[in-house]
Design a protein with these regions (language model features):
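Cation-handling catalytic/transport regions enriched in His/Asp/Glu
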Residues: 1-166
């Protein structure tokens, strides 16, 4: 839910994540570009949580269009990927082991929650609930099928490269 607090810029919005009456964490959404701002999408830890004493605090930074401009599919993938990191951090950031969990975990796992979350934009039933063009029309199923085919083209070559790097 919205969190009424000050932030470093008027465009930045604060939110709280609750589970019933228990505060899980707080976060800022810094979604739009501006002069001097970090140019990529990322989640930054602001304050670790301390079990029973303080909730974790983080920010999700992106550079998406303002106002009525529509987001591109790749931007939605990016948002959900980074939001996965944010949720991972918040849910793991308020207990005794928060320093070695959430986005502070081993590199072979740190991307897992965010990669799972970003997959939702490749599922037609999910994307049809929110992905609309300027006229309010839902993305056609055949267009998403073609986007998936384009994404998957040459996937084996990328896997082969990663295997060669691991050798």
């Amino acid at each position: 839910k919205p969190w009424a607090t000050e932030s470093w810029h008027e465009d930045v919005e604060g939110y709280e994540l609750w589970d019933g009456d228990q505060l899980i964490g707080r976060f800022f959404l810094d979604m739009h570009p501006r002069e001097g701002k970090y140019q990529h999408a990322a989640v930054a830890q602001i304050r670790d949580g301390i079990s029973g004493q303080q909730a974790p605090l983080a920010t999700l930074m992106c550079n998406f269009p303002r106002g009525d401009e529509l987001m591109e599919h790749s931007q939605v993938v990016t948002f959900l990927h980074e939001f996965g990191h944010l949720i991972h951090y918040l849910f793991a950031g308020g207990h005794h082991w928060s320093g070695v969990s959430g986005i502070s975990t081993e590199w072979d796992f740190v991307e897992a929650p965010s990669q799972m979350l970003q997959e939702w934009v490749w599922d037609y039933d999910t994307i049809a609930q929110f992905a609309k063009n300027a006229e309010g029309e839902v993305i056609p199923p055949d267009l998403l099928d073609r986007m998936i085919a384009a994404r998957d083209f040459g996937l084996g070559m990328g896997t082969r490269r990663q295997l060669s790097l691991a050798a």
